[in-house]
């Protein structure tokens, strides 16, 4: 196993099975964040993650963190909160604001550089990256974004500026995703937050098998059309 230097003249990636064990999943460096390369990466179970000032690093960890949307864990207190939720939830209304929110709401710093923002905004314009927004009246207070691969959604980041805002985004999205044929959410690497929401780890080989099947699936043609998903009760 060795770290592969990507060429700017080819969007090809090495097999994820060749990723390093330490650090877990590091596969390649270099290349660029062009739409074609990003889409090729997601189709192969690879994602970019790097610190500002570092070269672009590409990862495919083993095991892989995933969330089966029907297994989303919602605490009793969150269920009570959601019944009286003050939030309105929309899809694809404000992708730029959501990714900016994810970039700025990280006290410990962020990997979401200006180049990353620009790259994913371009994916959004092409219909591949999508956002869920949570509003308190007219103020954006939370949200999440990711990349669609058929009936699999690759979650990238979320943010919250008010109580339970990001959890509300995920809860409402999971419900809508399931109802329209969505199968799986990729969480990349397990952490305490995603584990508390019901995410689990599966072998990379299993994830790649799911990906290869699900990316060929289809959600309804109008699933990603900008729309309101949830409104507070009057």
Swiss-Prot record:
It is found in: Cytoplasm. It is an enzyme of class 2 (transferase). It holds the Pfam family Leu_Phe_trans. Its EC number is 2.3.2.6. Belongs to the L/F-transferase family. Functions in the N-end rule pathway of protein degradation where it conjugates Leu, Phe and, less efficiently, Met from aminoacyl-tRNAs to the N-termini of proteins containing an N-terminal arginine or lysine. This is Leucyl/phenylalanyl-tRNA--protein transferase. It comes from Escherichia coli O81 (strain ED1a). The gene is aat.
């Amino acid at each position: 196993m060795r770290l592969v230097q990507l060429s700017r003249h080819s969007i090809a990636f090495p097999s994820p099975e060749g990723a390093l064990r330490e650090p877990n999943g590091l596969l390649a460096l270099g290349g660029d964040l062009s739409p074609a390369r990003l889409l090729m990466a997601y189709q192969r179970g690879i994602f970019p993650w790097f610190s500002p000032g570092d070269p672009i690093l590409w990862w495919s960890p083993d095991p892989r963190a995933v969330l089966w949307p029907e297994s989303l864990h919602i605490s009793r207190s969150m269920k009570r909160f959601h019944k009286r939720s003050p939030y309105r939830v929309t899809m694809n209304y404000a992708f730029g604001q959501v990714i900016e929110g994810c970039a700025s709401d990280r006290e410990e710093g962020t990997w979401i550089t200006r180049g990353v923002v620009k790259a994913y905004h371009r994916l959004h314009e092409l219909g591949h990256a999508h956002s869920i927004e949570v509003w308190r009246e007219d103020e954006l207070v939370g949200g999440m974004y990711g990349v669609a691969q058929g009936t699999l959604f690759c979650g990238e980041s979320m943010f919250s500026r008010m109580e339970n805002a990001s959890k509300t985004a995920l809860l409402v999205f999971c419900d809508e995703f399931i109802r329209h044929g969505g199968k799986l959410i990729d969480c990349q690497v397990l952490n305490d937050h995603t584990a508390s929401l019901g995410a689990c780890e599966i072998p990379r080989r299993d994830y790649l098998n799911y990906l290869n099947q699900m990316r060929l699936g289809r959600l309804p043609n109008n699933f990603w059309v900008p729309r309101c998903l949830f409104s507070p009760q009057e």
